[in-house]
Design a protein with these regions (language model features):
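Phosphate- and divalent-cation-binding pockets in alpha/beta enzyme and binding domains
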Residues: 77-78
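Generic beta-sheet signal
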Residues: 63-73
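Short glycine/proline- and acidic residue-enriched helix-loop micro-motifs
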Residues: 29-51
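Alpha-helical packing segments of well-folded alpha/beta enzyme cores
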Residues: 48, 52-60
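Alpha-helix C-terminal capping segments
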Residues: 1, 27-28, 57-64, 100-101
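Phosphate-coordination/substrate-recognition cap region in phosphate-metabolizing enzymes
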Residues: 1-32, 83, 93
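Domain-level recognition of soluble alpha/beta enzyme cores
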Residues: 85-110
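Active-site catalytic microenvironments for nucleophilic, acid-base chemistry
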Residues: 62, 81-85
Length: 113
């Protein structure tokens, strides 16, 4: 029997308020989107990516064998700071991509099918 828990600590990054309610096409036309693509840690936001990392890291540190099913920026924040990456978007997961940490190294699961 496996126990599991659900936590609000892995909710989406509470980023830019002026993106809420807009389509992706509209968002891509903003100056913030240019910064987001280059170095999102430079954005002035409601919640920094480091703050996102801190709330996710708390779960990671308090559990063994942790599986996070979450939005891309939330998991990327965690991986970026946990692994001390040099560039935020370097190892950004693709949609539905499975990434994991093994021996403090980022690994990617490749579906053999």
């Amino acid at each position: 029997k496996m126990e599991f828990s659900i936590s609000e600590k892995i909710t989406e990054w509470d980023g830019l308020l002026n993106w809420k309610g807009y389509t992706f096409d509209e968002i891509t036309e903003t100056n913030e989107y240019l910064i987001y693509n280059d170095d999102p840690t430079e954005l002035s936001t409601n919640e920094t990516f480091f703050e996102t990392f801190q709330r996710v890291e708390e779960l990671y540190n308090n559990n063994n064998h942790t599986l996070f099913v979450t939005h891309q920026d939330t998991i990327r924040s965690f991986m970026f700071y946990k692994l001390k990456s040099k560039k935020f978007n370097q190892d950004k997961p693709g949609h539905c991509e499975l990434q994991y940490i093994e021996n403090d190294t980022l690994q990617k699961y490749t579906n053999p099918v």
